[in-house]
Amino acid sequence: MSARTLDGKATAAAIKAELRERVSALRERGVVPGLGTILVGDDPGSQWYVAGKHRDCAEVGIASLRRDLPAEISQAELEAVVEQLNADPGCTGFIVQLPLPSHLDTDAVLELVDPAKDADGLHPTNLGRLVLNVNRPITTPLPCTPRGVIELMLRHGIDLAGKDVVVVGRGVTVGRSIGALLTRREVNATVTLTHTGTKSLDEHLRSADVIVAAAGVPGLVSAENVKPGAIVLDVGVSRVEDPETGKSRVAGDVAADVAGVASWISPNPGGVGPMTRALLLQNVVESAERALR
């Protein structure tokens, strides 16, 4: 068996095309969605991620509001910038790029973000609303990566109803939030949340119809612990040394041999990553649409 590819790049491009039409419709009504970013310091990786988000905005017609701040900024000064974006009608969603310098209280900064403008969908208020909402239509921003994982499968014709999904990883970005989306009645999957401390992790993996690997452990999921025909999504991000070049490279949680066992697999990079970026834009557009209702 050779796994088919869950192509995140092509799927994200399709979502962006849809968003361009929605942004155009909003502009006709006098509303221009705007994504704000707050970047503290000059970390090259963070600068690269933020620049990518603004390139995405340009592709679909979303306005960019970039706030690049010095690494030595005080807590009060940073919180004032957050409040400015909260109050700016041209900003329909924004993110605070993490990590922040160690002298800053990250939780306090993130909780200050207006939940209606929470482009990442990870504000405590929005996560709480998601947990409480099993049936009703979603009216708050959703976590981008979990939503991207599900959308990637749905747009490849995969029906998740009744599927046993094993999630590996307990971080807020994916592990703790994806179960709330997968178990909504409109999706109707059954979810087991595991992590690197789970006993008999191999047994859980071998029983799964779908595996979402988000532990940040290179090669954690291999062919020997995936049942034939399973669907495998690689969300893990780690840095390892390339033995041939000696340089650092990004590695996922899923070993290459899984492609010979699974029915579908998401590449890493090129799978869930582009979906996360596309769904961030969708949160910004949806916030603008909700403001008009």
Curated annotation (Swiss-Prot):
UniProt name for this protein: Bifunctional protein FolD
UniProtKB keywords: Amino-acid biosynthesis, Histidine biosynthesis, Hydrolase, Methionine biosynthesis, Multifunctional enzyme, NADP, One-carbon metabolism, Oxidoreductase, Purine biosynthesis
Reactions catalysed: (6R)-5,10-methylene-5,6,7,8-tetrahydrofolate + NADP(+) = (6R)-5,10-methenyltetrahydrofolate + NADPH; (6R)-5,10-methenyltetrahydrofolate + H2O = (6R)-10-formyltetrahydrofolate + H(+)
SUPFAM superfamilies assigned: Aminoacid dehydrogenase-like, N-terminal domain, NAD(P)-binding Rossmann-fold domains
Listed GO CC annotations: cytosol
A biological process term (GO) from this entry: L-histidine biosynthetic process
CDD domains: NAD_bind_m-THF_DH_Cyclohyd (cd01080)
Record InterPro entries: Aminoacid_DH-like_N_sf, NAD(P)-bd_dom_sf, THF_DH/CycHdrlase, THF_DH/CycHdrlase_cat_dom, THF_DH/CycHdrlase_NAD-bd_dom
